[in-house]
Amino acid sequence: MNYVASNIQVLKGLEAVRKRPGMYIGSVSINGLHHLVYEVVDNSIDEALAGFCDRIDVIINLDNTITVIDNGRGIPTDIHEEEGISALELVLTKLHSGGKFNKGTYKVSGGLHGVGISVVNALSSFLEVYVNRDGKIFRQTFSKGIPTSKVEVVGESSVTGTKVTFLADSEIFETLDYNFDVLEKRLKELAFLNDKIYISIEDKRIGKEKSSKFYFEGGIKSFVDYLTNDSKAFQSEPYYIDGFINDVIVNVGLKWTESYSDNILSFVNNINTREGGTHVMGFRSGLTKAMNEAFKNSKISKKDIPNLTGDDFKEGLTAVISVKVPEPQFEGQTKSKLGNSEIRKIVEVVVYEHLLEIINLNPLEIDTILGKAIKAARAREAARKARESERKKNAFESLALPGKLADCTSKNPLEREIYIVEGDSAGGSAKMGRNRFFQAILPLWGKMLNVEKTREDKVITNDKLIPIIASLGAGVGKTFDITKLRYHKIIIMADADVDGSHIRTLLLAFFFRYMRDLIENGYIYIAMPPLYKIKYDNRIYYFYEEKEKEKFLDSIETKNRNSISLQRYKGLGEMNPTQLWETTMDPARRKMRLMNIDDAIEAEKIFVTLMGDLVEPRKEFIEQNALNVINLDV
């Protein structure tokens, strides 16, 4: 298929982009800055999906410009008949002017192709593009979306491809400081989803020099292996499904582990569909249908076994679903949920038919997986009975709030906050030091449950977790309803030592598995009590970081240092109620860390590594991150 100027169609102009950048890239924060890089890379990925590109290089240059190079066909440079300008200039200056809008050019497209690169141009103070095509090297430059040069031939070339260099506009973006790790993770994800494509990233900034290269022969199978390499698996390698119906390509990798939770990632045209959609619904129904058939035909005794559901078959399952759809319909501006109704049946048929073949070829492994599903079904029944029993006793309702909870008087969830505090002594100080109008205190005691190693029926009846579930008032697991939440700030307050860190991680794992909406909606915080108290010159100073304390000490003349009194806080219990209020609980002065899931894939891996059964991966992770553990955000 030829890719020339006539393939480029124009829908409308670029005027609004600089006025309302958030409508096109989500925000003007660092997330929007990274979005510019993704849009340019997505154009190169489109060439790869069409079979014309197998290498993409991304460079963060010394001056904070970004360069993206691919070996695709090169953007067309001939004159567009309708517009009377070169296709290259058209693609970079007109919104909705890309090969994506002509079905013959790209059957499927990630990113916005045309929308994306023109938006990048509009939001860059400088953009330069080189095109290797038709034996020549073409060049054109732009500023804030406006051409500053004509398309000119600057040399000869025996290869094809496109090189884009841009400088994001400092008048629009809050920062131009790219985060290498964030970009690296996205490029690694793209390399997993598009097998046999070489993708590299290099940071040339002084003091930040590093680079990574990705190439995965196994594609999605490699992705599943990466996600499960810290878990005990039932299979020697992932099962792989590859099929297509009506130009829709379906690729799925599956692997069952001994975990009690599932991890299903879904993508449409390389876009992470975090909210799922019709492709995920089709996967679940195809999986359930095939596995029920496998159970029916197996020699496993059917006596006293509850009906097996999709949730039972999903226990311990890690799956990556990737579909390529010619005309995807995404619900919402963020492209996080697929809406095409026809995709559900297509994915269901492909998954069902291919999974039946896999089942026939792997009878022993499938029997083991079915055995796990049966245990999950029995645990599900036990959890249902436990819920009903607890419901009858009002254990999860506000009428039966735990005795240790010191509640606040405000009835407005928007202003109410609850401190979940490690230890009775610290809980006592917190109760006395708090503002009783809007601050509630729930002390924790004893050993906290590790939910990564526990089935749901044991979780919802655990005597350490029931007080948390009851206090929050919104249910747990599948019955969790965030609209019933009694507090809009949930603050974990624990000692700044190894035990405190362990308790924080256990609580975060519980919220991640059973109340993930709390993290995704920004309701979970970590309290940051001070590490040091210094008395000097009749004044008291509190310091929350080692470097803050050192900077303060360095500012004091040597002759006066004998008059300094320094205390290192080992635990919350060392502070009296007034000190705890002033340093850790007063909204005007306290420091807290908001927990969020910028990267759900990495969050999943971290919890499995830290809380799972395998010791070696946990040891490696701790050794690699020991120096950064205070800054570990999940």
From Swiss-Prot:
Domain spans labelled Toprim: 416-530
CC cofactor: Mg(2+); Mn(2+); Ca(2+)
Catalyses which reaction(s): ATP-dependent breakage, passage and rejoining of double-stranded DNA
Keywords for the protein's UniProt record, in alphabetical order: ATP-binding, Cytoplasm, DNA-binding, Isomerase, Magnesium, Metal-binding, Nucleotide-binding, Topoisomerase
PROSITE patterns recorded: TOPOISOMERASE_II, TOPRIM
EC number of the protein: 5.6.2.2
A molecular function GO annotation: metal ion binding
Broad class of enzyme this protein falls into: isomerase
Binding site for Mg(2+) 2: D495, D497
Family matches, as Pfam families: DNA_gyraseB, DNA_gyraseB_C, HATPase_c, Toprim
Cofactor note: Binds two Mg(2+) per subunit. The magnesium ions form salt bridges with both the protein and the DNA. Can also accept other divalent metal cations, such as Mn(2+) or Ca(2+).
Residues that, per the record, bind Mg(2+) 1: E422, D495
Compartments reported by the entry: Cytoplasm
Main subcellular location: cytoplasm
Cysteines engaged in disulfide bonds, as pairs: none
Gene3D superfamilies linked to this entry: 3.30.230.10, 3.40.50.670, Histidine kinase-like ATPase, C-terminal domain
CDD domains documented for this protein: HATPase_GyrB-like, TopoII_Trans_DNA_gyrase, TOPRIM_TopoIIA_GyrB
Note: Few gyrases are as efficient as E.coli at forming negative supercoils. Not all organisms have 2 type II topoisomerases; in organisms with a single type II topoisomerase this enzyme also has to decatenate newly replicated chromosomes.
Subunit-level organization: Heterotetramer, composed of two GyrA and two GyrB chains. In the heterotetramer, GyrA contains the active site tyrosine that forms a transient covalent intermediate with DNA, while GyrB binds cofactors and catalyzes ATP hydrolysis.
NCBIfam families: gyrB (TIGR01059), PRK05644.1 (NF004189), PRK14939.1 (NF011501)
PANTHER family per record: DNA GYRASE SUBUNIT B, MITOCHONDRIAL, DNA GYRASE/TOPOISOMERASE SUBUNIT B
Family: Belongs to the type II topoisomerase GyrB family.
Protein name: DNA gyrase subunit B
Source organism per UniProt: Borreliella burgdorferi (strain ATCC 35210 / DSM 4680 / CIP 102532 / B31) (Borrelia burgdorferi)
